[in-house]
Amino acid sequence: MFEATLSRREVLRRGAAGAALLSTGSLFTAGNAFGRSGATVETVRWISPRGTLQVMDDFNLWVPLKMGYFKSLGIEAKLIAGSVTDALASTKFVAQNKADMGYPSPGVLTASIDSGMGVKSVWDVISGQVFNFGLPTDSKITSPKQLKGKSIALGSSGWKVIVDPMLVELGIDPKSVRYVSAGSSWMQAVATGKADAGLAWEGLRAQLAGQGLKLKYLIGTKWSKHPSNVYSVRAADLDDAAKRDLYTRFLQGVVMGLEFTKANPRAAAQITYRSLPDLQKTLKPQLALDSMLELAHAYGTSHLKGQGWGYNDAKGWSNYLKVVHDLGQTKKLLATKDVFTNELQVVANRKADAARARKDAKAYKLDKDFAQTKVRAGFTM
């Protein structure tokens, strides 16, 4: 049921599925960096929701990994591709101690907690809506509220659990729309007028444009307050001071990755792109940069509001929890305190060496391909 919310890029099938593991670094002593004199390395196993790591989405992890920020913080970061067949893998692996930090969608996180899994969000990557609606370029729809009574194309019927809460938030009865399950060509169905709208997301828009699809969009962050995919950990670990410190340091590295990206987006895109050989076969550098910029802007949602990177918005979560309960997606009406905490987020933002990241970014030398790329005018994060 929640498989589609977990692997929103499943239809693109870039890279190998399954629990393939990629790690860099080895056991070492962190030395004097970041005040961790003599500290031994500790491993954090992060699991993707997609069944692949061959996407630009995780630039905020590749940058601190490749720039040595995790290493300086005493962390060996292991990135796990995850499972494309197990919808709850990104929470289940964490609950079973096969991973330490997952990246579940709100639907997967709440379903997992509702079923008794002891996991909790410590970082909302976007702190707002990642999903959008794509429209034909000649569509007369100008507001998402006009989707009432319209047809919406989906890549899978399971995506209904993504769209239903979005419609309810807009005051639309999900029963009033007609879902069109069109497989991997769902956005082609929109472009050719076979559906009034289609589910899209940040990072996908640039890829669709690169494929020659002409569409316009109702951008979710402009009208939705619902949360997006989060970094979640075992709830019990949050009662362990050593684990809290470990995850906070990991998030400090994430903050540095984001600050680096803000200072030099092309460098962040180059680092990420060059780390992903399979992705290089399907995306050219400019398109990879464009895809990353869409996501990077969204990742900066709470930062632009002065709340720091990765803030879990209580109001947005509260509304979402009520909506999914009313829709029957959770049996219990979950309390926000059982779903997320911002305690680690606050400390990570305060302690991260943002100045070092910005300095490194400005000094980073671009290769020939990325030196020719352009950052779109007005980009912010």
What are these model-derived regions, one by one?
Residues 1-10, 17-25:
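N-terminal secretory signal peptides
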Residues 16-17, 99, 195, 252-259:
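Solvent-exposed alpha-helix faces
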Residues 36-192, 196-202, 213-225, 349-350, ...:
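Short, glycine-/small- and polar/acidic-enriched structural segments
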Residues 132-134, 230-233:
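Short glycine- and hydrophobic/aromatic-rich loop-to-beta-strand nucleating segment
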Residues 178-181, 188-197, 208-217, 226, ...:
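A residue-level marker of the well-folded mature domains of exported/periplasmic proteins
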Residues 241-332:
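Secondary-structure end/capping motifs
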Residues 318-381:
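Conserved C-terminal helix/tail region of periplasmic/extracytoplasmic solute-binding proteins
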